[in-house]
Curated annotation (Swiss-Prot):
Span of domain JmjC: 1089-1294
Binding site for Fe cation: H1133, D1135, H1262
Domains as described in the record: The JmjC domain and the C6-type zinc-finger are required for the demethylation activity.
Source organism per UniProt: Xenopus laevis (African clawed frog)
Mapped zinc finger ranges (C6-type): 684-709
Function (record text): Histone demethylase that specifically demethylates 'Lys-9' of histone H3, thereby playing a central role in histone code. Preferentially demethylates mono- and dimethylated H3 'Lys-9' residue, with a preference for dimethylated residue, while it has weak or no activity on trimethylated H3 'Lys-9'. Demethylation of Lys residue generates formaldehyde and succinate.
Record's protein name: Lysine-specific demethylase 3A-B
Length: 1334
């Protein structure tokens, strides 16, 4: 485990540095320590990109007044050396307790950022707790890899403790600010002032912009400052932990007291007290502090918790009273709340008395500290130190994070991070943190710091957990339902449309604040109306029967309401840290809801009774997963066959992988069944991937991990590489690690429905003659081998007749056969008009294509720039190879060539069904890459050929006959022609869409009029800098007026992009009229509409969380000048889903001359073909954007090429970052030529004109360069042809860092595949009676 200050050195602001300055400085390389080093801290920066040669930083120097601060040109001639703090290491140092002895001490090592002199083998270090920098040999510096290395040193050194705590606080706060986490909304901050008269000014965060990572603030000292970027200006969070500024009260000593319980293996509890007596005339407010970690996880701790009058070990409560309170709690209204950050503190239950306890008053004033605030002198309580409490004699001895268990006789539950049994670091369970005394700089106290090292981590401060140990005048912690103060309000960020069970990585958290209006209102939640039957415990007769019989029943409410004294799931423990009562009472958040079984013991106490098993489903649960034609909407027979033919093999692979995992589980472990919950997306707590079926769950807290994360963890443990995993695992209730062997295998699909559906798929494909190339051993109607489901009995509820018939499949209990190696498909017996092509040697085709690829490229590199006059030639008919080979050989217009070939081979045996697939591949090779003659290269106009592909489908070909362009967006046959190219992974363009749109809705004036006052994130396309303090109106004012654009520091008009606007909300909710206008006129509605029959996302039942597929707007100025050709409006990237991007408006700005000539040169430089140029010159169409799209199969070649270029330029390639997913590259003409020459990768150069819709396949890398100012709208969809790319990309995105927007799996590809197949076979089975008539 290496403890790193940050994930990377991407941000300098707030970091400490060591530098060497002087233009003519001369140094002795042998005396590095005697060089005139200067140290300090970076307060501001001019650019985010550290590699920008013009970057300047604003610094303060140590041992100098802050007024002597200055700007430094980082890569200028004055800066000879510049080192910044990097990570924590160990090095030899004199022992603090015995200077004559040398020990391994922790130190911060500095990394060279600018080095014009060589340090050789010398490293710069700063030992924690010391100010001086030292220079040691790198051989003496060791990384912190062992948890035990700091244990003894931490116990003995108070100075180190304080410095280490400060390091943790600083890193966590920086991470929260730089990531613009929503849990910092309403928090007070100190912002560094550039005004020479003051160093800091204070403010409050009113909102965050997660896309640009900017903060919206309110500052009374500087009202004009509304938006700041913490990556450019130093910002410090101000924590309100209690009364720390009241100088009239002196700190008193504190006392640690241990008490033993009646249980022999009770963990020793150490309690820390703070004796300050708060004023009685101040109203107390309970607040909840949240910390955002570098890995995106959220920690929640309690500030000023409520006190209790109950004795610490007063566990016993009459059963009748307990049941009465449970019934009262269950009567609350249910609602679906917003997701919150996960609490990593172990949480034991509290007695009802504790929940109703009074609340002591708060501290008088919050602290104010920042990077430059001197350290306080508050006292600290170190392990082993015993102090005397000089307080009120009547006060109780309490531990703030100790909570009594409500279960009768359960005296071992200590809660809140206190280990239930002695552990490796049990002696340090009360390790102090930032002192709560008035003079202390920090107010937070931490639990055992070594518990932080028990969690797998690769980056500091991942794995570090925080809790509060002591506050002024606080008694035992009471976690209550909600703050009872009448004036107190809760600021709740806007809810998502559905609940996502991923609390650790959710940006939302709740923090009690002073009475004020929330920064933005909460939108209604679609699942607010979801209701569940009342708990069985509310029925007196049923409750009595259950108590007498001891029968098990399913938990039908949240843990807090049903079983507060039993193990609580992670969500219910978080519920007690700040949700309103209505939110807490919602059972939908509980991970044990309809999952865990309970029963009453002989004493009438509620106990755990295990979990549901796969055979315990009911009709409602199983119907969601079975192919029932009555539940299928908007799916016809032909479409069902097409979908099954395209994704049936992927479904089989999905089932085979599930079977493989199931067969590898421990036979002695019972598989649990977790039923799907409406409006909840089950996600892996480690990698954020949506969980489809099999996963592993902790029976104590509900922590769940996917199959891949489980395997990775087991592999790392078995190989002894613990701590090196890509994904860290959260800890269990009381700080214990989650061990793989303690997790239980769990499935979501009930019973054997998954394997039954797989049987039906093979049966249906055989009956309907649908081609299949899956590797299943039961490919030809053989029953699938189903894993054994233990305790297989009849379901308790009767099944409907359709279910019984569908599930009436033989159950063969065998291990799945290994995947069969498919043999080469035999040649069909009959011959078709082009049957000779089936034996055409594809290797020759590929070789010929490759040879001519370079030949055609070399010829096109030196094409002269055509003039306007050169395009005045007469228009003649365009005859392309694509049109001739795809024209049917007969006069029958009913279908094109592939339909003809399919019809000729349909009567053959099953072995003959591979012919169309072979022809598809050959057509793809021939159409994409055949040698181009001079005739093909010559532009011959843009004719409309009504019968070109067997349909009345007007179209033509671009990109040297490699790009299909459909000319009539309303043609009903478009989708038949479209899918022939689409299935080959080619992009497609549809022109003329703007003729159907309401142009008034898409004009810049309409947007300026409706939304001009909204604040927005503007991006400088030339520098990628974020422009703060701007409005939507500022952007639209310069859309078609260059002099009216915002200017940079040098007075030059900026090329801006309006990023992620409208933000957050559904496009339909924000711009309903535009949404309807687009959806009513978007081409190929079978694919692009939300309910399109070929949009597989529409197959996902409303029971599930639907993926957000748009529409999304992309608005940006044009990059016109020759220097702008190296910049991209949108850099090279790829998307997990297919997309249709429509150019709805092109604005030609005023104020510049010869724009047409510059645009023409840019189009020519972008490798556009002559037909494209003809559209611009002769037909006077408005070009909007230049696209470069590459085939998905070439992604890895492009990735390796960009990594090689990055290494050549001296850039790093971190393992959790990706040159394509990072969107950090734009391939200009030089790079595109290198890519073609070195890797043979050629893309499609497409100019998108007004009204053009560009269809981009999933997984296809693409980039965009705006020629003029553009308004584009994109709609995503999931097509059957590209599901395989969606699935592969989901796996890729797992390995991205948590800061990537694509890291989270929002598409749910496995769920989409399953339900699309399920609906398809339901339609096919319902129409089996018509088979004889075909």
């Amino acid at each position: 485990m290496v403890l790193t200050q940050q994930e990377n050195l991407s941000v300098l602001v707030g970091q400490r540095f060591v530098c060497l300055l002087g233009k003519d400085l001369q140094v002795d390389p042998d005396t590095v320590s005697k060089w005139p080093w200067k140290s300090g801290i970076v307060r501001a920066a001019s650019h985010k990109d550290l590699h920008c040669p013009e970057i300047k930083i604003f610094v303060e120097y140590d041992d100098e007044s802050w007024e002597n601060r200055t700007w430094l040109e980082l890569y200028g001639p004055t800066v000879k050396m510049f080192l910044v703090e990097h990570n924590l290491v160990l090095a030899d140092h004199a022992s603090p307790s015995n200077p004559s002895v040398s020990v391994q001490c922790p130190a911060m090592v500095y990394k060279v950022l600018v080095g014009k002199f060589s340090l050789g083998s010398t490293a710069c270090l700063q030992f924690l707790g010391e100010k001086d920098k030292v220079f040691l040999s790198k051989e003496l510096v060791k990384p912190v890899r062992d948890r035990e290395t700091l244990k003894q040193f931490m116990q003995d050194n108070k100075t180190f403790n304080k410095a280490f705590q400060e390091l943790i606080r600083k890193s966590v706060d920086e991470s929260r600010l730089l990531q613009a986490a929503r849990n910092i909304i309403s928090m007070p901050i100190n912002v560094y002032s550039m005004d020479p008269s003051m160093q800091w000014f204070s403010g409050t965060i009113t909102n965050v912009r997660t896309a640009s990572r900017a903060l919206e603030i309110k500052c009374e000292q500087l009202p004009s400052l509304k938006i700041i970027d913490p990556a450019l200006l130093h910002v410090v969070l101000v924590h309100n932990y209690g009364d720390q500024n009241d100088k009239s009260k002196k700190p008193r000593a504190s006392k640690r007291k241990s008490q033993d319980t009646e249980s022999e293996d009770q963990t020793e509890v150490k309690q820390t007290r703070n004796e300050e007596v708060p004023s009685k005339d101040v109203t107390q407010k309970t607040s909840f502090l949240t910390y955002r970690r570098d890995d995106g996880k959220t920690l929640v701790v309690v500030d000023n918790p409520k006190a209790t009058t109950n004795n610490l070990f007063n566990y016993m409560t009459p059963a009748t009273e307990d049941q009465q309170k449970v019934q009262q709690s269950l009567s609350s209204k249910q609602s679906v709340p917003v997701g919150f950050g996960e609490t990593l503190l172990g949480c034991a239950a509290t007695t009802p008395g504790i929940q109703n306890a009074a609340t002591p008053p708060p501290a008088n004033s919050p602290p104010s500290f920042g990077a430059a605030t001197p350290q306080g002198k508050g006292s600290q309580n170190l392990p082993g130190d015993t102090t005397v409490l000089n307080g009120d004699a009547n006060r109780e001895e309490t531990n703030l994070f100790l909570s009594a268990a409500a279960s009768q006789g359960n005296k071992r539950s200590m809660g809140f991070g206190i280990m239930e049994s002695p552990s490796t670091f049990s002696s340090l369970s009360t390790m102090p943190s930032w002192s709560g005394q008035p003079n202390s700089e920090n107010g937070l106290k931490s639990e055992n710091l070594f518990a932080a090292f028990t969690k797998s981590s690769t980056v500091f401060p991942k794995g570090f957990e925080f809790s509060v140990k002591s506050f002024p005048e606080q008694k035992m912690l009471s976690v209550t339902d909600s703050p009872k103060t009448a004036l107190q309000k809760t600021c709740v960020p806007q809810q998502e449309q559905n609940v996502i069970r991923k609390p650790e990585n959710n940006h939302t958290s709740v923090k009690a604040i002073k009475p004020q209006e929330p920064p933005y209102t909460k939108s209604p939640n679609k699942t607010d109306g979801v209701t569940y039957p009342k708990s069985i415990l509310l029925n007196p007769q049923k409750l009595k029967r259950l108590q007498q019989s001891g029968d098990c029943f399913v938990q039908d409410g949240s843990c807090n309401n049903i079983a507060p004294h039993l193990h609580k799931c992670r969500e219910c423990r978080l519920d007690r840290f700040g949700r309103s009562r209505e939110q807490r009472d919602s059972a939908v958040f509980c991970r044990f809801f309809h999952f865990r079984r309970l029963h009453f013991n002989k004493h009438g106490m509620l106990k755990e009774g295990g979990f549901l098993t796969p055979n315990k489903y009911d009709a409602e649960a199983i119907n969601l997963w079975l192919p029932l034609a009555s539940s299928v909407v908007d799916l016809d027979l032909d479409t069902a066959k097409y979908i099954l033919a395209n994704i049936g093999d992927h479904f089989c692979k999905l089932v085979m992988s599930e079977k493989e995992v199931m067969s590898s589980t421990d036979p002695s472990k019972q598989v649990a069944w977790k039923r799907a919950v409406r409006g909840v997306r089950e996600m892996c707590d480690a990698c954020d991937t949506t969980i489809f079926n099999l996963h592993w769950v902790c029976p104590k807290c509900g922590f769940g991990v996917c199959v891949d994360c489980y395997r990775m963890r087991k592999k790392s443990l078995s190989s002894g590489e613990e701590g090196n995993e890509m994904f860290s695992w959260l800890k269990c209730m009381k700080g214990q690690l989650h061990e793989p062997e303690n997790l239980m295998p769990t499935q979501i699909v009930p019973g054997k429905a998954l394997y039954d559906v797989c049987d039906i798929v093979h049966s249906v494909r055989g009956r309907w003659g649908i081609k299949s190339n899956c590797s299943c051993s039961n490919k030809h109607m053989r029953p699938v081998s189903k894993p054994v489901v233990k305790e297989e009995v009849k379901p308790s509820t009767p099944e409907p007749e359709p279910i019984k018939s569908l599930l009436a499949q033989p159950n063969v209990c065998t291990v799945p056969d290994p995947p069969a190696i498919p043999n080469k498909p035999p040649t069909p017996a009959c011959s078709s008009p082009l049957s000779w092509l089936t034996n055409f040697p594809q290797t020759i085709v590929n070789k010929e294509n490759k040879d001519n690829l370079f030949a055609s490229t070399s010829k096109s590199e030196h094409k002269p720039l055509p003039s306007f006059a050169s395009f005045g030639k007469p228009v003649s008919a365009l005859q392309t190879f694509g049109s001739s080979i795809l024209t049917p050989t007969t006069s029958n217009n009913s279908g094109f060539l592939r339909n003809l070939l399919n019809a000729s081979t349909l009567k053959q045996e099953t072995s003959d069904k591979s012919t169309p697939k072979i022809l598809d591949d050959i057509f793809a090779s021939l159409v994409q890459s055949r040698p181009l003659s001079d005739f093909d290269r010559k532009p011959q106009g843009l004719p409309i050929q009504p019968s070109l592909m067997g349909f009345n489908t007007p179209h033509y070909w671009l990109c040297d006959n490699r790009l299909l362009c459909l000319q009539d967006p309303n043609n009903k046959s478009n989708w038949n022609v479209f899918r022939e190219c689409w299935k080959q992974g080619q992009p497609v363009m549809v022109s003329g869409v703007h003729n159907n749109l309401n142009s008034e809705l898409w004009r810049p004036e309409s947007f300026r009029r409706e939304f001009g006052d909204q604040e927005a994130d503007l991006v400088n396309c030339r520098t990628n800098d974020i422009i703060t303090g701007a409005t939507v109106g500022d952007f639209w004012d310069g859309f078609e007026d260059i002099p009216g654009r915002l200017k940079n520091d040098t007075g030059e008009s900026m090329v801006l992009k309006l990023k992620d606007w409208p933000p957050g909300e559904d496009f339909r909710d924000t711009m309903l009229s535009r949404f309807e206008d687009l959806m009513n006129n978007i081409p190929l509605p079978e694919y692009t509409r939300r309910e399109g029959k070929l949009n597989l996302a529409a197959r996902l039942p409303t029971y599930f969380v639907r993926p957000d597929l748009g529409p999304k707007m992309y608005n940006a100025y044009g990059l016109i000048t020759p220097e702008d050709r190296k910049y991209g409006t949108t850099n090279l990237h790829l998307d997990v889903s297919d997309a249709a991007n429509v150019m709805v408006y092109v604005g030609i700005p005023k104020g510049e001359h010869d724009q047409d000539q510059e645009v023409l040169r840019t189009i020519q430089d972008g490798d556009a073909d002559e037909l494209t140029i003809k559209r611009f010159i002769e037909f006077k169409e408005k070009p909007g954007a230049l696209w470069h799209i590459y085939a998905a199969k070439d992604t890895e070649k492009i990735r390796q090429f960009l990594k090689k270029v990055a290494e050549e330029e001296g850039h790093e390639n971190p393992p959790d970052h990706d040159p394509i997913h990072d969107q950090s590259w734009y391939l200009d003409n030089i790079l595109r030529k290198r890519l073609l020459q070195e890797h043979g990768v050629q893309g499609w150069a497409i100019v998108q004109f007004l009204g053009d819709a560009v269809f981009i396949p999933a997984g296809a890398p693409h980039q965009v360069h705006n020629l003029y100012s553009c308004i584009k709208v994109a709609e995503d969809f999931v097509s059957p042809e590209h599901v395989k790319h969606c699935f592969c990309l989901t796996q890729e995105f797992r390995y991205l860092s948590h800061t990537h927007t694509n890291h989270e799996d929002k598409l749910q590809v496995k769920n989409v595949i399953y339900h699309a197949v399920k609906d398809s076979i339901a339609i096919l089975k319902a129409n089996e009676s018509s088979l004889g008539k075909l």
